[in-house]
Amino acid sequence: MTIGLLATIKVQPGKGPEFEAAFADLAKVVKAEEPGNLQYDLFRAKEADTYVVYEQYADQAALEIHGKSDAGKAGMAKMGSFLAGRPTLQFLDKV
């Protein structure tokens, strides 16, 4: 079953461009190295310093691979330095 994930992310004021660049680097790795990833896109919200990542995975196993990959962990660590708090995650099941 396809799994969707919405991650709402608040970044520190003025750090948006750096966060966007770090996300772009991570997205390239995810799309190249995770065949079970179907979508991994960043959206800038209307609210200042707020982003939403829309992710889709072929199944639970693909989602777990994403959470455990070394490249993913490194990318998340890099982006983490720009965050203003923990992301809010909403998991979705495709109907």
Language-model-derived ranges and their functions:
Residues D25-L38, Q56-Q90:
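An amphipathic, aromatic/His-enriched active-site/gating alpha helix that lines ligand/cofactor pockets
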